[in-house]
Amino acid sequence: MINFLLLVLILSVLESQENVHTDELPKCMFGNNVCAKLQKNFQGTYLQQLCICEDEVCVKMLKNTNRTIAEPLCSRQTCSTSWRSDSHSKSATQGDNQYQFCSDIRNEFTKTCTVNQNAYKEATITTIATNKKEILHHYYCYCPPEFKYVYSTTNRVVNDTHKVESKFFKCEAIPSCNGDEVCKIAVERTNSYTVSKHCLCYNDKICPDDPKEAFSNKTQNDGSTYYEFKCPDLTICIE
């Protein structure tokens, strides 16, 4: 039950802006902000947009060789809504998930997360006067394919104008499944179907993610349905 609740928390955090329209999304404020997340699963490729890239970013560059005149060098930033190659400098691939960025994150992408390092942060920024909330996702280091994000801690900061609640996640190796342990949990909502991997099946067997192969399902009050899956030789199919 505890593992199920933890997986639900992770799924909820990484889908926190699923129903937010593009024109309501915050602007990406930092180079390591994730502007979109894509996931490949049974239903195809699911896109979750998280923040809007600035149309144009300008950096002052020195002109000519005398290095006395500075002029802006501007480049247009866009957030990809389609799957990129694993080597693309504006995306980070983690197994069936890919994180998109407005600008080059090559330095972060090449740094593999250490055991105790915070790998990912979700920051909820609330404007006190209006109670308006904005959520930004920060990427700190590369989490390899057979690893997962595990909730670590929450930090809260309040000043005269804003409240910021930051949830941190570590990068942890996905363990091998024990016995009839649940290997994946999927959540289905009106416009989305997303999957979280819990453990790896033995003998290179693939944990399913088709709802028809689910071991069990739970429908929540908000209409969403959570499916639990087990490794193929232990799965009991339900209608």
From Swiss-Prot:
Its main location: secreted. Contains 9 disulfide bonds. Keywords: Disulfide bond, Secreted, Signal, Toxin. Residues 1-16 form the signal peptide. GO terms for cellular component: extracellular region. Coiled coil: none annotated. It is found in: Secreted. The keyword Manganese does not apply. GO terms for molecular function: toxin activity. Expressed by the venom gland. Belongs to the scoloptoxin-11 family. This is U-scoloptoxin(11)-Sm3a. It comes from Scolopendra morsitans.
